[in-house]
Amino acid sequence: MTIEEFREKAKDEEYAPGWDAIEDAFAVCYPEQNPNHYGTNFEARAMFGGSEYIDGYSIYQSPHGHKHIITFGMTELYADEEAFGGKYSRWGYEMTFKLKADTTDDCMWAMNFLGNLGIYTYVKESWFEPGHFMSNMGKPIKTGADSMITAILAVDDTEVSGIDTIYGRVDFLQFVGITSEEYEMLKEDPSKAKLLIEAMKKDNPYLVTDLGRKKSYLV
C-alpha cells in the first residue's frame, strides 16, 4: 500500500488496519469462526486518559479443546500516518493465552491478567520476548485459586504465526503458566527456558495453561 492509498482509506473514521490484520491472521487458524469479543470501556482507555492499554480481547474456540485469547492494543490498531511503514508495529506483538475453559466467562481472569501485563509494558516500558518469564509474586496467576501456577513464560504462539503489516512486524506472544519451582530454576539459569518448553510440549503441544498442574517439568 502506498502512503497516498493509506491517506485515502484513513478518511474513513472506522478504518483500523492493525485490528483487521490481527483478525485476518487468526482467521487463517479459525476460518469462518466469529470469536467472542470483549471491548474495554472507552473512558478507561489510555488514549482517553484512562489506565487501560488494551482496547479489546477476542476469544476463539480451538478444535483442540481450549480457548484461545488474543489482545488488541499492544500494536498500532487504528489509522496513524506516523506509524505507516515502521519496522515494528508499536511494541511489535500482541499477547495470547490458551486456557481449558467451558465458557468465555471462565476466561475473564486471564484477560484481566493480560491487561495487567499490558499496563506493565506501557508504564515500565519493559517488553516481553520469547523466553522471558515473570512471577506473580509467588501467588497463583488466577487470584484466589488453589494452584501451583504462580508465574508465566513467554513463547511464540504455537498456532498463529506473526505477520507483516503496514505498520511493521506483529508477532503473537503466548503466555503459559508455570510453577514456582520452574520459575526459580529459570531464575538460576534462564537458558533452561527452551528445555522447559520442549518438555511441556510433550504432554501439552499447544502450551495450554492448566491451573491444576502439579507436575514440574524442570528437575
Tell me what each language-model feature is.
Residues 1-219:
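Acidic, proline/glycine-rich low-complexity IDRs
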